[in-house]
Amino acid sequence: ELAAQTGLCRTVKVLAGLHDSNAALLAARGFDAIAGNEATILSTGTWFVAMRLPGAGTVAPVLSEARDCLINVDAYGQPVPSARFMGGREIESVIGIDTRRVDIIPDQPALLAAVPAVINSGAMMLPTLAQGCGPFPMREGHWLNEPGDWFERRASMCLYAAMVADVSLDLIESQSRLLVEGRFAEAEVFVRALASLRPETEVLTANAHNDVSFGALRLIDPALKPNGDLRRVQPLDQDLSAFR
């Protein structure tokens, strides 16, 4: 009946759309190191969504709905333990949307250089700026020793995002391997802080076209592979244990 009404061939495939974070999950599975292995994808944008792909035989963790954890379902109907917080919105609420982004590539050396001053001064944003969301939904965000320098301010917010992401990853019992994708994968203070906070985890980013559009394309052709490789992220030079 639908074919008759539309004039489409009876053999045409109709594909339903999927959420961008779910498309990111499909894109990540294009890498051999991720597909079929215990791994977590941290998709970063307005929302930071951590999605764990449990290894074979792994028992799913008990998740806390009150701390913004849930079981998502991937494109193939499989359960995906997940946790989320509004990391991008929180960062932008402090530093602005366009003028002082934390992921501007030419600014990365200066942002990394600002980290020691942030740690030494005790500058820290406490959660939560987007109240009602994330692992600390009832807390009210505020500064400790608010920095005046804009590089230090931006570096502080990257450390804040890494700290909250670290807690969210613990809540879904993330382990072994973590691929950070999306806009904030280019924020070196953020990804390197994650590598520092999770020394037992292989923290990765991709130098390939592996965004959500590629993930949606893999829904049509699951055999597609990314045109690049994964990069292992090195920890920060500074010790974050006291800061944490």
Regions found by a protein language model. Give the residues of each.
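Active-site core segments that coordinate phosphate-bearing ligands/cofactors
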Residues: 4-179, 186-244
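Short His-centered aromatic/hydrophobic patch
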Residues: 1
